[in-house]
Amino acid sequence: MLQYIPLSNLPYSHIPLHHPSLTISTKCTRIIMHGTCLSGLYPVPFTHNSHDYPHFNIYISFGGPKYCITALNTYVIPLLHRILTTQFIYTYANITKKSPLKSPKHKNILFFNHNT
């Protein structure tokens, strides 16, 4: 059984990524992200919607239709490195083909080594 921990209890919790419903799995192997950010500097608050997409461990949703890669590189990847203690492998940006069932149209999928 996966354990989930609130983002507010983790390192980098001062970064404006927190949302009351957000949880991060310590055993996560796949994360899918979609949406946009308020500017090129930081994302809007996240929501946790894994129940809508059971084939992924975590979904983190931004606030609009256009994905902000700057927010991913600046905040999200470093945050997830610290949370998951895993090694970042690949980023697939704006994948619209070969989408999993019920996945959003615009998305990024991050794959991590399962070494937690």
UniProtKB/Swiss-Prot annotation:
* InterPro entries in alphabetical order: DUF468 (IPR007414)
> Per UniProt, what is one Pfam family of this protein?
DUF468
Highest taxon, organism lineage = Eukaryota
Q: What else is known?
A: Contained within a telomeric X element core sequence.
Family membership: Belongs to the UPF0320 family.
Name by which UniProt lists this protein: Putative UPF0320 protein YJR162C
